[in-house]
């Protein structure tokens, strides 16, 4: 019963997080955090009840579904230590430290804090022309100061606190998926969850194309300034980042269904005559998602899509028959390109050749962000403080606010420093290597291999896209990223249900 409740909440979050404007508003990501918290609490209750039940028995028979067993989990690996160290680093940014310690660990932080306390002139290197030297103009507030003689490593502790709870929740969600015992048959439950992700991706694609081609240009009740396809994500680039994970995962799911039918029918003629309509619908849905990503006109999104389709075709080539490439991903991509060409790709193509100004603006943001990293090299300016601290370093004039550095890795480095980004990179490499080893441990022709390869290719595509966009900063994309990564790590533990 509890497992089914957890499953219901998880499915609800997989649907809610992208549709609620990518969960970027405070109310949306707060509901996401509450949903994750409820799942963890329910799992803890279930774990406790099973433990009490087993203790009450005079003899301790083995539990058939092994509810007390911790699966092949990262809880027994160095990954947990690295995750804990990263969270401790963020907590370290939020606790008051002696000013002398801050002066050693972050000299520029000490200089700014000293300016707030003493009222001395602001460092001239941080003032852009026309700016004020008041604390509020720098994105800082003297109310964030702790008691006399102590400073925070984070320039804006409240912003760091908000972002810390986001990361804590998502890390908790990732670890929860490592230990949760799927209800009923694990393979069937996993297929159901992947199908939900696929359907949400198709809905976002169809809705986005309807709004774009009809001329409404809306995301639910919000009017969009851009005519590109964006679904309910507001930004085409965030929308592209989401689909970059969904499309390879869906291709892997499609091929896993195909493999099931091959294993069952033993022969391509028998399989072809018995091809299930659902497989054709899944293939059509993938074509629709690729089509919508093309019409999003996200340049790096399209480049990452082409890369991911090529990569998944190469990785699947050796699974059967020794082919040089897997034909199905190539066929799906070609069909989507032909359909897009029939509709008209003039606007998309022209955008690729008018990118100089856009790249120039990104380059300016990157250069100024590097200046931030140089001033806060070890521990950063504080997780979640980029929007407030960047105006001190901005060397160009814009209307509005720069919310992201247009590069996840660079922004995280400015927020958590070289120490924090180093921990995250080591953690990512360790988990990615473990996921690859898990997939390689599966037997040839195991349908789970297709799902695993599709999930990993989606993760790689998102990382490539993150070189010029913000993806980890978007709650819906971060939630799906954590889900796919956790599921791929769990695949060797999942008992697959043959169709």
Regions found by a protein language model. Name each.
Residues 93, 235, 363-403, 409-412, ...:
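TM-adjacent membrane-interface loops and short helices in multi-pass inner/ER membrane proteins
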Residues 102-153, 372, 384-392:
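Extracytosolic (periplasmic/ER-lumenal) interhelical loops and adjacent juxtamembrane/interface segments
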Residues 222-227, 350, 390-396:
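Short glycine/proline- and charge-enriched loop/turn segments
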